[in-house]
Amino acid sequence: MRGAARLGRPGRSCLPGARGLRAPPPPPLLLLLALLPLLPAPGAAAAPAPRPPELQSASAGPSVSLYLSEDEVRRLIGLDAELYYVRNDLISHYALSFSLLVPSETNFLHFTWHAKSKVEYKLGFQVDNVLAMDMPQVNISVQGEVPRTLSVFRVELSCTGKVDSEVMILMQLNLTVNSSKNFTVLNFKRRKMCYKKLEEVKTSALDKNTSRTIYDPVHAAPTTSTRVFYISVGVCCAVIFLVAIILAVLHLHSMKRIELDDSISASSSSQGLSQPSTQTTQYLRADTPNNATPITSYPTLRIEKNDLRSVTLLEAKGKVKDIAISRERITLKDVLQEGTFGRIFHGILIDEKDPNKEKQAFVKTVKDQASEIQVTMMLTESCKLRGLHHRNLLPITHVCIEEGEKPMVILPYMNWGNLKLFLRQCKLVEANNPQAISQQDLVHMAIQIACGMSYLARREVIHKDLAARNCVIDDTLQVKITDNALSRDLFPMDYHCLGDNENRPVRWMALESLVNNEFSSASDVWAFGVTLWELMTLGQTPYVDIDPFEMAAYLKDGYRIAQPINCPDELFAVMACCWALDPEERPKFQQLVQCLTEFHAALGAYV
C-alpha cells in the first residue's frame, strides 16, 4: 500500500522485554512509555532497531540472561510479563533505566539468571539513606560465578523503621567473561518508601516478688494517651460528619443551578501564530498501540443505527422544557459558522432578573429550510453534556423553543471559538508574528481535553464524537469540550455515510465502533488519540488519503496515521497507545492526564 510504513508485528507490548501483557499497569503511564523503543520517522519504513550492546567477550558469547520472572513482575507492578535486563548477552538499557518502585510492604526482590559458559560476577549495593533502610542483603555470595542452570537469587530490602523517607537503592552487578579484563556493569535502580514504626506501649510490669503481673485490658484504667486517642477520634468523626453535610448541601445546590456564570472576557485579540511545515499524509502500521492496559474493563454501549431519528420533535422539546427561556432575552449578532441548514451566532443573553446585565453566548440554530429531523437532532445532541459541571466541559444553559420560532440552543461564549478553526488559523498565520503557539501550549490543550473526558468517563458518559471540531477555546487557551450538535452540517468533510444512511466521523472512530457500532470510554480514548494528532498537526484531517469505505480494513491490518513532523516520540507514543485494536489495552483517561502532565512539566523544564 502506498504511503504506508510498518512498525513490525501488530499486537506486541510497548514494554521492552515483556511478553503477553494482559493485566493493568498500576505505575504511571509515562514510566511505561519511557521504555518504548524509538519509533521510525514519518513516511519511512521502520529500519531495523539498533542491536543492543552485547556482553564483552573475546570468544563465543556466554549466553547470559538475567530477568524478573512473570510472577515477580506481577507481584511488583501488576503485569503478566517477564522483564528482561539481559537476554542471551543482549542488554536492555530501556529496562535498566527504569527506576522501579518497590511496594512498601515488599521486603524481597527475586532475580532469575543463568549462563551457558563461565561468567564471573561481583555484586554491590548503594543506599542513599542508611537511617531509613539497612544495607541490602543477598542469599548468594557477593562474588562468584553465574550459575550454569536457571537459578533465582534474592535481595532483601528491609527498612529500619526509624524515619519516614523514600530510599533510592542502586544494585551494581559486574559481569566478567572468561576472566578477561573486559567487564560489563549493570546498574539496577529501585525506590522504596520506608515508614517510621509506632512505639508499642509497655503494659507489663514486675511486682515486688519479681513475679509478672497480668495486664487486664478490660478492667485496667485508661491511660492518658488512650483518652487522648479516643477524644481525637471523636473530634475527627464530628469534623468529617460536618464536612459531609456541607458537601451534600453544596452538591444539591450546584445540581439545582441551571444558569452557569460566564466570566469570560468580551474582548478578543488576534494572537500571532507561527506557520508549521507542510507535510504529506503518511501512515504507519504500528505495534505500539497494544500497550498500557486499563485498571478495569470499559462499559460498552451498543448504539442502534439512526436511534436519534426515533425521537420526535415534540419529545425533544419536552426534554429541554425546564431550561427554556423567552426569545426576547436573546440578541443575535455575527454569524460565526454556517452550514447547509445550521448556523452558530455570537449572541447576547439578557439576565432574567436584571435586564441591564448581559452575557455573551454561543447560539446554535437552524435555517428555515431545515427539516424536522434536523431540528430534532440538534436539540437531542445538544443535551449530551447537559447537567454536567466541569471546567473543561461546555454544556448548554438555555434553549428557545417558542412556537413559530426556530429552536435555539444557548451555550456560554468562548471568544476564540471552534478549536479546529483556531488550529487551522494558526497554520495560515505567517511566522513573523511576535507570538506563536508553542508545543507546550498544544500539550496543555490536550491535558484539558483529557481532564474533561476523564470526568465524563467517571460519570459513565460516552461522548462518541470527540474531535477538535467539537471543542472551543478562549484567549487564555482554555479548552472546553462541547456536544456535536450541527457538527455534521458545519464540518461535512469529517463525516461519511457508509451505505447505512448515517453520517459518522469515520476517521475518528475505533474499529469496534466502525464494525459493530459499539461505543465505550475506550472508543472515546481512540478518538482522543486522533484529537491529539489534530493538535500536533494544527488541524489537519487524519487519514485524508484513505477511502472511508476502506477504513475498517485499514485499521484491522494494523495501519495508523503517521507521526506528525516535529512531534516528540514520547507524545506520538501516547497517541499510539490510544489506537490499540483491543479496547481493554487502551489507557484510561486518568492515565493519559497523568502522562501528559508529566510530559508538559518536562517540556517546561527546557523553556
Curated annotation (Swiss-Prot):
Q: Show the segment(s) annotated as Disordered.
A: 1-20, 266-290
The record's account of how the chain is modified after translation: Proteolytically cleaved, in part by presenilin, in response to WNT3 stimulation. Cleavage occurs during neuronal differentiation.
Q: List the membrane topology term(s).
A: Single-pass type I membrane protein
> Where are the Extracellular topological domains?
26-227
Report the principal subcellular site. Answer: membrane
Q: Which gene encodes it?
A: RYK
Residues covered by the Protein kinase domain = 330-603
Q: Where is the active site?
A: D465
A Gene Ontology cellular component where this protein is annotated is: membrane
* Task performed by this protein: May be a coreceptor along with FZD8 of Wnt proteins, such as WNT1, WNT3, WNT3A and WNT5A. Involved in neuron differentiation, axon guidance, corpus callosum establishment and neurite outgrowth. In response to WNT3 stimulation, receptor C-terminal cleavage occurs in its transmembrane region and allows the C-terminal intracellular product to translocate from the cytoplasm to the nucleus where it plays a crucial role in neuronal development.
Q: Which SUPFAM superfamilies match?
A: Protein kinase-like (PK-like) (SSF56112)
On whether Glycosyltransferase is a keyword of this UniProt record, the answer is no
Q: Under the GO molecular function aspect, what terms does this record hold?
A: ATP binding; coreceptor activity; frizzled binding; protein kinase activity; transmembrane signaling receptor activity; Wnt receptor activity; Wnt-protein binding
This protein's name: Tyrosine-protein kinase RYK
Phosphotyrosine-modified residues are where?
Y495
